[in-house]
Amino acid sequence: MYKEINCRRIVPGIGTGKALVTKDVINFLAMVDTKSATIIDRNHELFGRSIKDIVLVFPNAVGSSVGAYAIYSLRINQVTPAAIICMNNADIITASGCAISDIPLVDMLEKLSSFILESEMEISVNADKEVVTIKTV
């Protein structure tokens, strides 16, 4: 069974993978090892987890505009997320980083009051059609 949720496209594209969900913001420059795509901040909920080939679900990024280049470094090192979902409005760091790295990015998911995204759920982000599809049990 699948559940579709409408969203807003920020960066076009399609990405599919297991969700990695956090309520913590991410500073891509300070918290992510751009060679391995691993969260290296010991105080972060996702410490030790890789964001490679997954659908990253988080509120938004924080930090300086250099964070966009940290996201681009993930692309150079071939360790990008399959797609990113910002649970808040997408911020300029994430939007510009995803744009230069060709990572699908969406925000403003509808219907989340009745549905909770959890890590390990299979998610497909189709930013082109502005829809997120979640495989449910």
Please identify what each model-predicted range represents.
Residues 4-13, 20-131:
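Feature captures the catalytic cores and cofactor-binding loops of soluble hydro-lyases/lyases
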Residues 133-137:
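Short beta-strand-to-coil "C-cap" segments at the C-terminal boundary of structured domains/repeats
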